Design a protein with these regions (language model features):
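C-terminal functional extensions of proteins
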Residues: 2-7, 90, 337-424
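A short, basic/flexible loop-to-alpha-helix module at the beginning of a structural domain
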Residues: 94-108, 276-282
Length: 424
C-alpha cells in the first residue's frame, strides 16, 4: 500500500512548512535565521540581486511555506489513493469518500441469513451484498462429487465446493482473485493428483490443515483473503451423507447417486441423523431481520440444511420473515414435473414446523428457443400455481425474476429488490 511512505513524506512537509513560518516570523529555530542571512548574503554578493538582508528570511520563509504545502498536498493525495485502492481493489474510480460512505452504509444494513447451496445460493448472495454486509450464508455440506468429493475422501475434510462459491459471490476483491479461486486444473499436462480440482477448494483444504483440522476457522481465514461482505458457515461441522428413499421404496446413499437415479425421490435423510449446527448458525437465525431459503436444488441443497437438528426449531422461533425462493426450471432427476407448490410441499414434508411465510415465484417465461433448449435436457418451466401456494398457508410473491443469457436463472438484482421490499 505504501502508506508509511506517504505519511512520512507528509510529516516532512509539515516540518518544512513550520521552518518556513519560523523564518517568515524572524524566529531562530536551531539558528536557522543566521544561516538564511548568510545564504542571502552569498546570493547578493555573487549575483546582481541586492534586496537587502532584512528581506532574506521573508523570501526564504515564504518559499519554504509553499514547498511544505506542496509536499503535504502531494503526500495526502497519494495516501488517499493508496487507501482507496486497498478498500476497493480493482476499482480505483471510486473516491475515498464514496468508499467510506458505501462501507458504512453496508455495515448498517439489515441482517440477512441465506440458507441453501449450489449456484442458486451464490446468485442470491451477489444481489444481497449490494444492500448489506450483514449477511450470513448457511451452506449445505453433502456434496460428494467432483473436486469436493475427492477432497472429502483424500483429506477427510468437509466438501468445500458450495462454500467456495458463496465466498466468491460475497467477495469484495479484484476480479483476478475471483478468477483464481474458480480456476480448475484440467488438460493432459495436469497430473492425476491435480486434475479436476479447483484452486479455491485446494486453498480451503490447505487452510484446514494450517488450522489444525478446524474447517470453520479455515473458512474464516479464506474469507479474509477474499475480503468478503458477510460470513459463510457450514450448516454442520460433522461429515454427513445424504440418503434417499425413492418412489419404489429403494434406498440410495450419496448425493451423486441419488441425483443420477431415474427414480423419483420420496424422502431425503441425513446420515447420521442427529448432527447439529455451529452455534453461530443458530445465533444468526435468532438475530436476523429476514431469512431467505434458496434458490437451489430442493432435495440436495435446500432440505439437507433443514434436516440438521436445531435449525428448523431456530427458524420457527425466529421473529424474522422467512422467504423461500422457488426455482425457475425443474431439475432432471430431482424435481421432474414439479410445480411451484410441489417444491413447497417437498420442504414442508421434511420439516415438522411451519418455517416459511413468503414464497417468491417467477411468472415470466423465457424465450421459446430457450425453452426448447432446456426441454431437450428434460427441464421445463416451473408452473407458478400461486393459488395452491396460498392455500398451503404461504403468501406467494409472483413476478419476473429471471435473467436470460445463455442459461435461464434468477436475476440477482431482481431477487434482492424483492427481498428488500419485504422489509419496508
Amino acid at each position: 500500500m505504501k502508506v508509511k511512505r506517504w505519511i512520512s513524506l507528509a510529516i516532512a512537509g509539515i516540518i518544512v512548512e513550520l521552518l518556513g513560518f519560523a523564518l517568515y516570523n524572524h524566529a531562530r529555530p536551531f539558528n536557522i535565521l543566521a544561516l538564511a542571512n548568510r545564504f542571502w548574503n552569498w546570493i547578493s554578493n555573487n549575483t546582481s540581486m541586492n534586496l537587502g538582508e532584512q528581506r532574506a528570511t521573508l523570501y526564504i520563509g515564504a518559499a519554504l511555506i509553499l514547498l511544505g504545502m506542496f509536499i503535504i498536498l502531494f503526500a495526502l493525495s497519494r495516501l488517499m489513493q493508496s487507501v482507496t485502492t486497498a478498500l476497493t481493489p480493482g476499482n480505483t474510480k471510486d473516491s475515498l469518500v464514496d468508499v467510506i460512505y458505501r462501507n458504512r452504509f453496508l455495515s448498517q444494513g439489515v441482517r440477512v441469513v441465506v440458507i441453501g447451496g449450489g449456484t442458486g445460493l451464490s446468485t442470491m448472495l451477489r444481489g444481497l451484498k449490494q444492500y448489506t454486509s450483514n449477511i450470513v450464508a448457511v451452506v449445505t455440506v453433502t456434496d460428494d462429487g467432483g473436486s469436493s468429493g475427492k477432497l472429502l475422501k483424500q483429506l477427510n475434510i468437509l466438501p468445500p465446493g458450495d462454500i467456495r462459491n458463496c465466498l466468491v459471490a460475497l467477495a469484495d476483491s479484484e476480479a483476478t482473485m475471483t478468477e483464481l479461486f474458480q480456476y480448475r486444473f484440467y488438460g493432459d499436462g495436469v497430473g492425476e493428483g491435480l486434475r479436476d480440482h479447483n484452486f479455491g477448494n485446494l486453498l480451503i483444504a490447505a487452510m484446514t490443515g494450517i488450522s489444525g483440522g478446524d474447517f470453520e476457522k479455515a473458512v474464516q481465514l479464506t474469507s479474509k483473503v477474499l475480503n468478503i461482505r458477510g460470513s459463510v458457515l457450514p450448516s454442520t461441522l460433522q461429515q454427513v451423507r445424504l440418503q434417499g428413499e425413492m418412489e419404489d421404496g429403494s434406498i440410495i446413499e450419496g448425493e451423486t447417486n441419488i441425483v443420477a437415479s431415474p427414480l423419483k425421490i420420496k424422502k431425503i435423510r441425513l446420515l447420521p441423523f442427529d448432527v447439529e449446527p455451529p452455534e453461530e448458525v443458530k445465533e444468526a437465525i435468532e438475530l436476523a431481520d429476514i431469512i431467505v431459503i434458496g434458490p437451489g436444488s430442493v432435495y440436495t441443497s435446500i432440505i439437507p440444511n433443514l434436516l440438521v437438528k436445531g435449525i428448523p426449531e431456530a427458524l420457527r422461533k425466529a421473529k424474522a420473515k422467512k422467504v423461500y425462493i422457488c426455482n425457475v426450471m425443474t431439475q432432471p432427476g430431482e424435481t421432474d414435473g414439479f410445480s411451484a407448490s410441489d417444491h413447497l410441499r417437498a420442504i414442508q414434508c421434511h420439516t415438522s414446523n411451519r418455517i416459511i411465510d413468503y414464497m417468491i415465484v417467477n411468472t415470466a417465461s423465457p424465450s421459446l428457443e430457450m425453452l426448447n433448449k432446456y426441454r431437450k435436457t428434460g427441464s421445463v418451466l416451473v408452473e407458478p400455481d400461486t393459488d395452491r401456494i396460498r392455500n398451503m398457508g404461504v403468501r406467494p410473491i409472483p413476478g419476473n425474476y429471471i435473467n436470460q443469457t445463455d442459461v435461464v436463472r434468477h436475476d440477482a438484482v431482481l431477487l434482492a429488490e424483492a427481498i428488500m421490499r419485504l422489509l419496508l
